[in-house]
Curated annotation (Swiss-Prot):
Its main location: membrane. It is found in: Cell inner membrane. It is a peripheral membrane protein. It comes from Trichlorobacter lovleyi (strain ATCC BAA-1151 / DSM 17278 / SZ). This is ATP synthase subunit delta. Keywords: ATP synthesis, Cell inner membrane, Cell membrane, CF(1), Hydrogen ion transport, Ion transport, Membrane, Transport.
């Protein structure tokens, strides 16, 4: 819970800075790349959690990573600040929170669309258009297949689920029949 509060504080500051400089998307891309490098490299994560490494050594490791990733100056300074404050371990949570706050700032939603069968592009675009019209926001859908739905679509937007799957409809009919 503490890490969530810390992540939110850092992410919020970076979103505000990105918004002021019109660099929200660039920051997002750079943070995803750096976070991906950390996620894929256990030794790198261990180095930042290891007290045997001095603060200067950790800063140099981060500088090398920043140079390889060709991060912007603002993201580079942000990452070095995380090293200074010993918050690099919070990077995954910061990036996740940044994405959510950046989407809110930009008016973007990322619904999860689950169907029983794979959708073609025209079907995804039709659902996307309907959601954009309903929400008034830009929609960036994520689509997955779950054959247990039998048919229909389940759309999850944050905490709200729109379930028009055959599986759910059959379950409702079953409940009605059992209750009499």
């Amino acid at each position: 819970m503490i890490n969530n509060a810390i992540a939110r504080r850092y992410a919020k500051a970076l979103v505000q800075l990105g918004s002021e400089k019109d660099l929200i998307d660039r920051f997002s891309q750079e943070l995803k790349v750096v976070s991906g490098v950390f996620a894929g490299n256990a030794e790198l994560r261990a180095a930042f959690g290891n007290p045997a490494f001095t603060a200067d050594q950790k800063k140099q490791i981060m500088r090398d990573l920043i140079a390889r990733m060709q991060c912007s100056e603002l993201v580079a300074n942000f990452l070095l600040l995380l090293v200074d404050k010993n918050r690099v371990v919070c990077l995954p949570e910061i990036v996740e929170t940044y994405e959510k706050l950046a989407d809110e700032q930009s008016g973007v939603i990322r619904p999860m669309i689950t169907t029983a069968f794979a959708l073609d592009d025209s079907q995804v675009n039709a659902i996307k258009g309907a959601l954009e019209q309903k929400t008034g926001k830009k929609v960036v859908p994520q689509v997955k297949v779950d054959q247990s739905l039998i048919g229909g679509v389940v759309t999850q937007i944050g905490d709200i689920a729109y379930d028009s799957s055959v599986k759910t409809q059959l379950a409702r009919i079953h409940d009605i029949l059992q209750k009499g």
